[in-house]
From Swiss-Prot:
InterPro entries: NDK-like_dom, NDK-like_dom_sf, Nucleoside_diP_kinase, Nucleoside_diP_kinase_AS
Active site: 115
EC number(s) per entry: 2.7.4.6
Main location per the UniProt record: cytoplasm
Subunit and interaction comment: Homotetramer.
GO biological process: CTP biosynthetic process; GTP biosynthetic process; UTP biosynthetic process
Cofactor: Mg(2+)
Alphabetical keyword list: ATP-binding, Cytoplasm, Kinase, Magnesium, Metal-binding, Nucleotide metabolism, Nucleotide-binding, Phosphoprotein, Transferase
Family to which this protein belongs: Belongs to the NDK family.
Known role: Major role in the synthesis of nucleoside triphosphates other than ATP. The ATP gamma phosphate is transferred to the NDP beta phosphate via a ping-pong mechanism, using a phosphorylated active-site intermediate.
Protein's recorded name: Nucleoside diphosphate kinase
Gene name linked to the record: ndk
Species of origin: Chlamydia trachomatis serovar L2 (strain ATCC VR-902B / DSM 19102 / 434/Bu)
Length: 141
């Protein structure tokens, strides 16, 4: 079973969309193997998004991600990375498929409701950034 990291971003947490987003994941067959709500520090946000450090949007992304609490989850299931990315939709909500999380809850390319790992390799790195191995439960019976 694959695992991937999902973050419900401050905009969706603030608008009380947590339950709706989790329902989309669960209805698609993805299971939650770990979950917690955190308010990221500047250091944590910069560390998580270090791959974007040289990009022009980096500081705006960090500022947004520390603007309120986020819900960090490990999703598990067959093809979890690809399924999560399909459920999220395109980064820009205006280009996201109808019914996708970003089409439903995203506002803009920067304020786009959720983050999801883009590869199995990055999923492993991202999961370990937020969770110890003992915090991740095999949720598939």
């Amino acid at each position: 079973m694959e695992q991937t990291l999902s973050i419900i971003k401050p905009d969706s947490v603030g608008k009380a969309h947590i339950g709706e987003i989790i329902a989309i994941f669960e209805k698609s067959g993805l299971r939650i193997a770990a979950m917690k709500m955190v308010h990221l520090s500047v250091k944590e946000a910069e560390g998580f998004y270090v791959v974007h450090k040289e990009r022009p949007f980096f500081q705006e992304l960090v500022d947004f991600m520390i603007s309120g609490p986020v819900v960090v989850m490990v999703l598990q299931g067959e093809n979890a990375v690809a399924r999560n990315r399909e459920l999220m939709g395109a980064t820009n909500p205006k280009e996201a498929a109808e019914g996708s999380i970003r089409a439903l809850f995203g506002e803009s390319i920067g304020v786009n409701a959720v983050h999801g790992s883009d590869s199995l390799e990055n999923a492993a790195i991202e999961v370990s950034y937020f969770f110890a191995k003992t915090e991740v439960v095999n949720s598939v019976a």
